[in-house]
Design a protein with these regions (language model features):
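A contiguous, basic/glycine-rich beta-loop/short-helix subdomain that forms a polymer-engagement track
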Residues: 24-26
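Electropositive, glycine- and tryptophan-enriched low-complexity nucleic-acid-binding patches
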Residues: 29-92, 97
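Hydrophobic/aromatic beta-strand patches that form the interior of the parallel beta-sheet core
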Residues: 3-5, 55, 124
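Two-metal-ion acidic nuclease core segments, chiefly of the RNase H-like superfamily
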Residues: 106-124
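RNase H-like two-metal-ion nuclease catalytic core shared by retroviral integrases
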Residues: 124-133
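Active-site- or DNA-interface-adjacent structural scaffold in DNA-acting proteins
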Residues: 1-18
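A short acidic (Asp/Glu
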Residues: 13-16, 99-108, 133
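Hydrophobic beta-strand segments of well-ordered beta-sheets in folded domains
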Residues: 1, 87-91, 122
């Protein structure tokens, strides 16, 4: 089984000005300054290239190694019944700062994932960082 995992930039949630224009009949009221942003979401996603299925996960703090592995755990819990025959998992990663080959925390968390699930996990990195397109 092969999956591709990636995270995106933090999204600030709220009625903040984006410098755009209203396309509706009535303009949407927004705050005129984006200071003291309180609400944010960190999006992450997993794609199964063979089936075309995708799985989105969100956090509220930062893009970290643990955030990425937690997303993989969530995906596995969601798909475990359907993928019960899978013994090997190949994970494509973009070699970004939260998951690159030098991050011992990421490797430690991935080892925990492999031990918990019983899967043989292989990490495949795109090089250089952020060139996963």
């Amino acid at each position: 089984m092969r999956i591709s995992v990636d995270t995106k930039a933090i999204i600030h949630v709220g009625e903040y000005s984006r410098g755009g224009r209203s396309r509706g009949v009535v303009a949407v009221k927004v705050l005129d300054h984006d200071m003291c942003l309180k609400e944010k979401l960190v999006p992450g996603g997993i794609l199964e290239p063979v089936t075309g299925r995708s799985f989105l996960f969100f956090g509220t703090h930062y893009k970290t190694s643990d955030f990425m592995v937690d997303g993989i755990f969530l995906w596995w819990e969601e798909r475990r019944q359907e993928l019960s025959g899978v013994k090997h998992l190949v994970i494509n990663l973009d070699n970004g700062p939260e998951c690159n080959g030098h991050r011992s925390q990421f490797h430690r968390s991935m080892t925990e994932f492999a031990d918990t699930t019983g899967l043989c996990v292989r990490l495949v990195y795109y090089n250089p960082p952020y060139h996963s397109k």
